[in-house]
Amino acid sequence: MKGLEYDTSRTGLDAVLKDWQQKATQVVWSSPEGANSRTVHVKVNQMLKGETISRASIINFLEAMREIGVLKGEEKTGKGGYHWVYYPAMDEAGFKRFITEQILSSLMKSFPNETKEALKNINP
């Protein structure tokens, strides 16, 4: 995941994140003291009620979000060796701004005149 993908057929965070990814992000947002992948994995699977997501998927997602700056991470030592603890780098409102900025920035690079014109024509 080098960046986020936006599905124009969906709305809200559903356009950017799968259900389990939203839940994983919520777990970290609600844990200012930080959360490791095991904690996120357990809580997400409890929230999914009947469905499950692998710990590897959780780890890959958390790392991708850390790499693009949505989450912060700190490598710590503990029982069993090293592990990452993830912290919010931004809250939900900040994440929504981040998504918007990423999309608009990409559009401005690809279609600067058309993007400016389209933004003028949008009625809030």
What are these regions (language model features)?
Residues 1-26, 31-34, 91:
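Short alpha-helical segments that sit at the start of domains
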Residues 17, 76-97:
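Short, cationic-aromatic polyanion-contact patches
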Residues 42-55:
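Short helix-coil junctions and helix-kink-helix linkers
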Residues 58-68:
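Basic amphipathic alpha-helical segments that dock to polyanions
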Residues 93-124:
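Amphipathic alpha-helical dimerization/coiled-coil segments
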